[in-house]
Amino acid sequence: DKPFFTFPTLASNCASCTAISVIYNADGTFKEYAYLKAPALHTFINTKIIAESPEKLFWAGIGDALSKEYEVVFACRDKGMTHTPLLGRVLAEACTKPLVSYGKKALEDCRNNVSSKNIEQIALDIIITTGLVSNFTVHQNNPDPKDDYYYNSSLAHCVYYGASLFPKCEHDHLHGEIVSFGVLCLLTYDEQFEERQRIFEFNHSIGLPCTLGEIALTEEDVPAIAHKAASVVEWTYVPGEPSEEKFIKAILDTDKAGKEFLAKRI
């Protein structure tokens, strides 16, 4: 119950600003979430330290933050939301634009260990904006289960949790890297094809994946990914009637579209 503070030395995710912890099994597969009573009282960010952190982890942080707007807006659809989750939904819409505007230059600055406005804007987006959205859009383990909600993540993270079943992917590819491919799968599932094209362009511009092969997965792995997805809390908040078959098709269609996209860039 004591107040605590966080001092993130990486901008690889929003963990330092949230009241959510992810628990994994000993083999690296996703197990469950742990919900804290409150997030840190204050999060201190030193952009010089972030600029000197490993570029690959900063890059993965961009991929993770990329999911926030799309997942929250998708998960909230057609839900009768009260003030707090509604505030989170509105704030989520501020997550993608900074990544597209500053992300590529921020990566260059991180590569050169230069503290800059680009680094600052991306670090704030990855750690603070997405972290606040997480805090506003999750309310679990209430005395009355009808008061529970979980809009913080959705199908993009479902791809990640399914991918964690495969050591060839989970051991060699970072969380945000895999999630960024999941964003494309969500957009396919939701038939947002114009937006998917924009994210293909963005991912490709900074080296994030556009296909299964780039994260060491194959078409044969997809049914197991979808089956794992159907077991996590995010699945219960997919709009309409979530379907493993539809999700399998969305992942395969994304992979096909990604291959076609990359072929045109050769």
Each language-model region and where it sits:
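Intrinsically disordered or highly flexible coil/loop and linker segments, enriched in small
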Residues: 75, 79, 108, 112, ...
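Active-site segments that bind and position negatively charged phosphate/pyrophosphate groups
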Residues: 81-202
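A glycine/threonine-rich phosphate-anchoring loop and its flanking beta-alpha core
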Residues: 2-95
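C-terminal charged capping/lid subdomain of soluble metabolic enzymes
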Residues: 192-266
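A short secondary-structure junction motif
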Residues: 69, 73-77, 106, 129, ...
